[in-house]
């Protein structure tokens, strides 16, 4: 752990609502340096929920090699075409890793790719949802600097929590923040240097069991303590349900089941799960859509974005 990392000494760094930067979309980055935390599922459910509220939504997949979010959206488009129905669709783009052998050149190439995909989304959407890979990559770090809201899905396991903090096994006290918490802090610092507004970091407890197990209670206590030390908000995520895996092949979300079209029948369990999605969107406390400035670049122009000015 580098000596430069410091906990959030000022409580004001934890925002109750991330401020919208005038004239551009609000960027929601879904980040966690561990695969299998439900980032892509969460991304599409939030996107569909926001579209249902009347917002214009763009999605970016930075894990183009695995491409879970991209395939999810492809499956969705194919399902709608097969069934002859209309489904809410975000404007989607995938950003591939550079193949250049030189590291510096590759990172510059990836930055350019990311900015080219981000620019039209910033200019034409109300929200840009960025799905990041479950590993530390240059693309992921670049996206984190742009986050107005950072959402970190966290499986209810001390294995997953280890990315945020080292925990004493006997006392369950926080020994020190861990690799991802440090990475987020560094990106916060870089954003501040570039004149960006404070990031609203939200950690969602994902795949919660319905059982009142001791592990669940201990996790809750540790996460609440860590939130105060590192500087994030805690939100209830999505419970562990088979339906999420079943919906992937059709590209559907729980919010689509009421639309018909041959999808799974709606059960009481699905109704409860759908409410979890809505509760999550509410907990994010995203800013309302705002009119774009007249000088905003049209979607067809690949103007290079610059970090937002301090507000």
Predicted segments, located by residue:
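C-terminal lobe/tail of nucleotide-utilizing enzymes
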Residues: 1-22, 192-311
């Amino acid at each position: 752990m580098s000596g430069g990392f410091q906990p959030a000494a000022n409580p004001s760094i934890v925002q109750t609502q991330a401020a919208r930067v005038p004239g551009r979309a609000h960027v929601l980055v879904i980040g966690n340096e561990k695969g299998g935390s439900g980032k892509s599922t969460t991304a599409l459910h939030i996107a569909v929920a926001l579209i249902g509220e009347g917002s214009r939504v763009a999605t970016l997949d930075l894990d183009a090699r695995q491409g879970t979010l991209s395939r999810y959206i492809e499956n969705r488009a194919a399902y709608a075409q097969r069934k002859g129905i209309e489904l809410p669709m975000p404007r989607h783009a995938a950003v591939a890793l550079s193949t250049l052998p030189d590291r510096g050149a590759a990172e510059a190439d990836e930055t350019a790719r990311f900015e080219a995909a981000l620019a039209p989304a910033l200019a034409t959407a109300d929200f840009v949802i960025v799905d990041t890979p479950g590993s530390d990559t240059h693309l992921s770090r670049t996206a984190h600097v742009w986050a107005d809201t950072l959402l970190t899905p966290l499986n209810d396991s001390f294995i997953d929590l280890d990315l945020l903090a080292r925990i004493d096994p006997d006392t369950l006290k926080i020994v020190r923040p861990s690799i991802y918490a440090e990475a987020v802090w560094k990106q916060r610092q870089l954003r501040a240097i570039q004149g960006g507004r404070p990031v609203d970091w939200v950690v969602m407890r994902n795949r919660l069991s319905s059982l009142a197990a001791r592990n669940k209670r201990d996790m809750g206590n540790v996460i609440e303590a860590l939130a105060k030390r590192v500087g994030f908000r805690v939100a209830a995520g999505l419970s562990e349900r088979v339906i999420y895996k079943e919906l992937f092949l059709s590209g559907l979300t729980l919010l689509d089941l009421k639309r018909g079209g041959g999808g799974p029948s709606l059960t009481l369990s699905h109704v409860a799960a759908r409410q979890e999605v809505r509760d999550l969107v509410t907990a994010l406390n995203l800013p309302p859509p705002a009119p774009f400035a007249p000088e905003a670049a049209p979607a067809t122009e690949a103007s290079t974005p610059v970090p937002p000015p301090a507000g």
